[in-house]
Amino acid sequence: MKNTLKLTLFSLMAIGLLACDGNTKKLTQDDLKKAEASLFNEDRSIKVDEAPKVAEKYCQFVEQNPGDSTAATWLFHAMEINVMMKNADKSIELCNQLTKQYPDSEWAPRALLYVGSFVYDDILNDTAQAHAMYQKLIDEYPNDPLVEDAKKSIEYLGLTSQEIMARITMSQLEEVNIDDIAE
């Protein structure tokens, strides 16, 4: 009985090791570029069925190479693909991973704005969480060029596209000097 149990455990461990070994191929930049190329049709439209596989490859590369100088870039692209697929939970997860793992990368503030706008505001219609993402960008990256976009996004939260256009038009009209018109 003991020998049968040992043999069973050994067999299960061997199968597990073989199964894992097949999925842990070390990905290279070339692998990612090939995956990226497979994402598009000839007319540059997205192959929707390929998108999840490509995003997963990007994540796998980051997991295997967390210190690589391009890891934050690939993680951002994985997040972008998930946003495009309207996979809100995965998009938020990847944004959180990116801002925690690579807070000093150029992609961290972009991820906050992207998820605030496209996930919380557009997909989930959660203006409170969208506001929180914009505010996090403003607070944690005060010198980033995207801060102004985040401030405008907060100003426009909850407005329809028509209301936003009306505000922009009014703002532009207010900037015009009346004396300039009279001349």
Which residues are covered by each model-predicted region?
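Terminal, low-structured helical/coil segments at or just beyond the last alpha-helical repeat
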Residues: 136-140, 145-183
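C-terminal motif of bacterial Sec signal peptides marking the signal peptidase cleavage site
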Residues: 16-19
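Bacterial signal peptide processing site
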Residues: 21-24
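Structural register within alpha-helical repeat arrays
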Residues: 41, 78, 115-116, 154
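TPR repeat positional signature
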Residues: 31, 58, 75, 112-113, ...
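Short solvent-exposed coil/turn linkers within tandem alpha-helical repeat scaffolds
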Residues: 61-71, 99-108, 124, 138-152, ...
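Helix-turn-helix repeat elements of alpha-solenoid scaffolds
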Residues: 45-57, 84-94, 124-127
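Residue at a conserved register position within TPR or TPR-like alpha-solenoid repeats
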Residues: 82, 119-120, 158
